[in-house]
Amino acid sequence: MNKLCVGLFGTCGNSTWRNPFMEKYKSLEINFYNPQIEDWTPECSKEEAEHLASDCIILFPVLDETYAFGSLAEVGFSILQTLRLDDKRDLIVLITDHLSEELMKDEIQAKESLKSRALVYQHLKKIRSPNVYLVNTLDEMLDLSIKLYENHKRIRPFRKRFNPHLREY
């Protein structure tokens, strides 16, 4: 079942990109899931995987603050999930094409990260799916996520009521 929820995936580490998103979502009473918690344990992975598989909107900013190998892999898994014919979820992706100065100091990791980012970005540009969005800034990501959430909220009762062929939405 798709949850009427925005999943705040993507760059973790010490990143604070989620803070303005959560503040805005709270002010608009938008449900969200934040996988970046202080006391994360392996047991948290079950809830995180559930949200990644079922939230109606998934955000994936891949920022310059980490090498992002895990986030890039999650983008791939999520794309596969959203390309299913019966999936009514939306995926919003932002991939920066650079790294912070600090991360550039490790030339091998930096080179691999930049290569992976470029490849994933180019593959995403080729995907023909109406529910995969590529944005250039966090502001665009926030604005689009709010609009998509409003659309999901409006259409949800009608899908449940009038379309018996869709899985529970």
Where are these regions (language model features)?
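Conserved catalytic or regulatory cores that recognize and/or transform ribose-phosphate-containing ligands
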Residues: 1-169
